[in-house]
């Protein structure tokens, strides 16, 4: 995960997300992990404000990298293969955390939820006017996604922290693809791929009743 500290470029993340789905619409975990590493670089480039999310994401990515590099790596090539493997071998804690707190299914679910928040926030940045308040955009995205899984104390602290967010222009410049209007255009290309990966993952987890894993 050392490369999570290097510079962010939205084009690189776009390429990674384009590679996430194969011809069978399976979510390939290597490009999924690579995509998230790029998003972590974006969050880290904006300072410590998003550290409560990026630190958790980094820990989850390390778990997934261990699974991909372990003796059962062939079962972790895609999200679909992972779900089938872990469910058939009872490697998932379905009702309460006990024997498998670092199962791939639980780990990806946390990444999946965070991706929903980031997708909503980036879409807000893309479609909002130049003078839009990023604190409001981020809070709205958070309340529509991650907030449901955080205790009140965390929700309160996060909402207060959002008030210190930089301007919309600073966010767009942090994407390193040129002027703000070019970043908006690039987001328009990237977000449909992110949305597609999210939708396929959501459908898979819903089909197997995995959306509320402890």
Curated annotation (Swiss-Prot):
Outcome after substituting residue 113 to E/L: Strongly reduces phosphoceramide transfer
Result of changing residue 53 to N: Slightly decreases phosphoceramide transfer
Impact when changing residue 56 to V: Slightly decreases phosphoceramide transfer
Keyword annotations of the record: Cell membrane, Cytoplasm, Endosome, Golgi apparatus, Lipid transport, Lipid-binding, Membrane, Nucleus, Transport
Effect of residue 43 to R: Nearly abolishes phosphoceramide transfer
BP GO terms, sorted: ceramide 1-phosphate transport; ceramide transport; intermembrane lipid transfer; negative regulation of autophagy; negative regulation of interleukin-1 beta production; negative regulation of NLRP3 inflammasome complex assembly
Pfam family membership, one: GLTP
Main location: cytoplasm
Statement: the UniProt record of this protein carries the keyword Cell cycle: no
Effect of residue 60 to A: Nearly abolishes phosphoceramide transfer. Induces autophagy in a dominant negative manner
InterPro entries cross-referenced by the UniProt entry: GLTP_sf, Glycolipid_transfer_prot_dom
UniProt effect for mutating residue 158 to N: Abolishes phosphoceramide transfer
Topology in the lipid bilayer: Peripheral membrane protein
Tissues expressing the protein: Ubiquitous. Detected in heart, brain, placenta, lung, liver, skeletal muscle, kidney, pancreas, spleen, thymus, prostate, testis, ovary, small intestine, colon and peripheral blood leukocytes.
Catalytic activity: N-(hexadecanoyl)-sphing-4-enine-1-phosphate(in) = N-(hexadecanoyl)-sphing-4-enine-1-phosphate(out); N-(9Z-octadecenoyl)-sphing-4-enine-1-phosphate(in) = N-(9Z-octadecenoyl)-sphing-4-enine-1-phosphate(out)
Binding site for an N-acylsphingoid base 1-phosphate: 56, 60, 106, 110, 150
Family that this chain belongs to: Belongs to the GLTP family.
Function text: Mediates the intracellular transfer of ceramide-1-phosphate (C1P) between organelle membranes and the cell membrane. Required for normal structure of the Golgi stacks. Can bind phosphoceramides with a variety of aliphatic chains, but has a preference for lipids with saturated C16:0 or monounsaturated C18:1 aliphatic chains, and is inefficient with phosphoceramides containing lignoceryl (C24:0). Plays a role in the regulation of the cellular levels of ceramide-1-phosphate, and thereby contributes to the regulation of phospholipase PLA2G4A activity and the release of arachidonic acid.
Listed name of the protein: Ceramide-1-phosphate transfer protein
